[in-house]
Amino acid sequence: MAFHSLLLLCLAGLAFVSETAAVHHEGEHSKCPLMVKVLDAVRGRPAVNVDVKVFKKTEEQTWELFAAGKTNDNGEIHELTTDDKFGEGLYKVEFDTISYWKALGVSPFHEYADVVFTANDAGHRHYTIAALLSPYSFSTTAIVSNPTE
């Protein structure tokens, strides 16, 4: 039974990640250089109103706030940054999971889910960071693509 639950969880994650391709901004077909998508694994739908912060590691080895946002009705945040501002570096995406679950009346285990990654070290890329949340676990994945794809 646990295997089937894990399998369904993985399939749900694949389904929502596969839909994170291009988005439409003001009628134009484009992609954001950094996009976040969050899914509530318990309810099987997008996680709405999740606070997300993006930090960039400084030369002094401290984390500096780079961008912030809140997931929309599709569990997504677009336009966190621009191609010009999103340079090479070490970034951390912080999902405020405790506030999300407490707003639903659930007491979760994790306060935050963090994803730390190096961006644009092999040339300019676009990144989709996807998170699948439950009160006692989380899973993340990333899609890294060339801006022209």
Curated annotation (Swiss-Prot):
Name the InterPro entries for this protein: Thyroxine_BS, Transthyretin/HIU_hydrolase, Transthyretin/HIU_hydrolase_d, Transthyretin/HIU_hydrolase_sf, Transthyretin_CS
Residues the entry annotates as binding L-thyroxine: 37, 76, 139
Under the heading SMART domains, the entry gives: TR_THY
Q: Which Pfam families match?
A: Transthyretin
The signal peptide annotation in the UniProt record is 1-20
Q: What is its main location?
A: secreted
* Compartments (UniProt record): Secreted
The family this protein is said to belong to: Belongs to the transthyretin family.
What does this chain do? Answer: Thyroid hormone-binding protein. Probably transports thyroxine from the bloodstream to the brain.
Q: How does it assemble?
A: Homotetramer. Dimer of dimers. In the homotetramer, subunits assemble around a central channel that can accommodate two ligand molecules. Interacts with RBP4.
UniProt-recorded name of the protein: Transthyretin
